Amino acid sequence: MFKAKVLVVGPTESGKTILANFISDATETIGGEYNPTQGVRILEFECPNGNKGSSCEVELWDCGGDSKFESCWPVIMKDSHGVIIVFSADIPSHLKEIEMWHLNFIQKQRLQENRCLLIAHKKPGSGDERERLNLSPALAKLTLIYSNLEDDPEDVRMELMKYLRGIVSSLSESRDREEMSIIT
């Protein structure tokens, strides 16, 4: 069974923990009092691998958004297979902040764009306007999904599972190539 390590990063109060809990089925509730993540939380769950009938164990690393944890980032990034950048579409400063997250967690790691996901998260009660976001050219290359767990939780789950299956598929192909190179 494959094991995929996916980081969930982004500015403080963007909804990273809510999304991590949601995708890993760690909790049923969506709302609640804000409690900032200290350092990192690791959630483990199985993700079915679509057409191959097998599954993959996913480690979802829910990373605290406070810059005081920056010294931990190299250790957190080590051996990661994917990065999800979460930001609040309701907080204008987040658009600028996610550029820093992209630089540190995607560009510096030289992660392929198909292993990255950008999520514009809407907090419960904030409406569902999907305004056009003014993203930098580097961020505009990433897949962007809008997340509103109140109105369309299954659409969000479907998009996240599609993203995770893509990572699992990449890992599988990589392993197959490695095995073939050993054989030949």
From Swiss-Prot:
Keywords from the UniProt entry? GTP-binding, Nucleotide-binding
Which residues are involved in binding GTP? 10-17, 62-66, 122-125
The record, for InterPro entries, names: P-loop_NTPase
Instruction: Indicate the family of this protein.
Output: Belongs to the small GTPase superfamily. Rab family.
Entry's Gene Ontology molecular function annotations? GTP binding
One GO cellular component term of this record is: intraciliary transport particle B
Matching Pfam families: Roc
Which organism is this entry from?
Xenopus tropicalis
Instruction: State the Gene3D superfamilies in the record.
Output: P-loop containing nucleotide triphosphate hydrolases
- The protein here is known as Intraflagellar transport protein 22 homolog
KW Oxidoreductase (keyword) present = no
